[in-house]
């Protein structure tokens, strides 16, 4: 599962968070957060934890196929 980078950046901006803030709030290691932000494939649970930390529904930040 991948995060949509633009949607993720918008959610981070709305939450007034940078990468370090997201790392702290999600409790995930920096490389994992960087993988999510970079659009690399990660486990669904990881995307879920990021969405939870940002206070958004996971569907708002995932990459969807057209």
PLM feature spans:
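Short C-terminal boundary/hinge segments that cap the last helix of small helical domains
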Residues: 55-66
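Short, basic-rich loop-to-helix N-cap that marks the start of a DNA-contacting helix
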Residues: 39-52
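Recognition helix of helix-turn-helix/homeodomain-like DNA-binding domains
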Residues: 27-42
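A short, Lys/Arg-rich alpha-helix, primarily the initiator
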Residues: 1-21, 25
């Amino acid at each position: 599962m991948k995060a949509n980078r633009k949607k993720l950046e918008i959610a981070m901006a709305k939450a007034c968070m940078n990468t370090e803030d997201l790392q702290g709030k999600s409790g995930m290691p920096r490389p994992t957060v960087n993988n999510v932000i970079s659009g690399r494939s990660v486990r669904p649970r990881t995307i879920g934890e990021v969405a939870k930390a940002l206070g958004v529904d996971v569907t708002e930040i995932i990459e969807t196929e057209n």
